[in-house]
Amino acid sequence: MRPDYRRRRSGRIPALLGVLVGFGLVATIAWAVVGISVGGGGAAESGSSTGLADTGPPKEILRIVFPEGFTRKEMARRVAAVNVIAEEERGIVPSLNPKAYLAATDRTRNLPAGFKNVHPPNLEGFLFPATYDFTEDTTSPQLVSDQLDAFEHAWSEVDMEYARSKRLTPYDVLIIASMIEEEVQVPRERTLVAAVIYNRLREGMPLGIDATIRYGYDIPPTQAILESQLERDHPYNTRKRIGLTPTPISNPGLAAMQAAAHPAKVDYLYFVRKPDCKSHYFTASLREFNHYSRQGLLC
C-alpha cells in the first residue's frame, strides 16, 4: 500500500530543500518501494545496504545519496538533512547523526589495503560517494564502514602502473582525483586536468588550483576567495606551494580516480574556464592562458 501523498507536511521540508538546492544540488523526496529517497548530484548507485538486519520485524529502509566531490563535512550535512526528512515525513528518528558521522570519519585505523602506510588526519578522500540504504538502527560508524568498503571495491578497478612509473603513491593519486572532482564538470576533461597536474608536478610548478584554497580555508562555493587568502602561505594554497596538498580536498568517484591514475598524453600546463563556466580551455602557452583568462573572468 502506498503512503498517502495528501498527508500534511511540516514547513521545515520546503525550507530544507531550499538549503540543499542552495548548495547546487537537485534534492528530491520520493517514495520508493519502502522508505525515503533523497537524491542529488548524480552520484553513482552503489547498491550498498548499511546495517540492514536479516532477522526480526522488517524495518523501513531509508536511502542517502552522497554525490561525487562532497567533502566529509558536506556528507555530515547531508546526514543531518536526511534525518530531518525522515523524522518529518515518516516519523522515524535515525541513529545516524552528523556529529557522530564526523567523529567516525576522524578514525583512520582501518584504511583500505594499499594505504596502510598513510597517516591522514581523517578519512577525507576515502568516503566513497554513492547511494546507501540504511535503517533507523544504522549507526554512523556502520555507514562510514560501508563507504570504506565501497571505496576499496572501487579502488580495485584503478590501475596504478602508470602513476607508479611517475613515482606517485596511491595516496598521491587519490589527492589528484579529489582535485579533478572539484575542477571538472565535463567528463571528457578529467584526463586533461589530470595531465596538467602531472605536467606541473614534473616541471616543479605550483598547481594553482583554487579549489584547494577553498578547502583549506573552508570557503563556501558561494563566497569569493579574498586576495589576502590567495597571497597567504598555507599548506592548501597551491598558488604558493609546489606539490600536492597534504590530503584530498574531496571524496572522488571512480571516474576521477581512474583519470588521476591515467592522465591524457598532452603537454598542457594551463586550463581556464570558458565563458560557459563549465568547460575549459587547455594550453601549454602562458600567453594563450592569459588571453583565455580574460574571457572567463565572469566565472
Task: Please give the residue ranges for each predicted region.
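Small-residue-rich helix-loop
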Residues: 187-235, 240
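Short, glycine/charged-rich beta-strand-loop motifs at protein surfaces that mediate ligand recognition
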Residues: 241-248
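Short acidic (Asp/Glu) and glycine-rich catalytic loops that position anionic groups and cofactors
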Residues: 173-174, 234-238, 271-273
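Short glycine/proline-rich, acidic loop/turn segments that cap or connect secondary-structure elements
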Residues: 225-234, 258-268
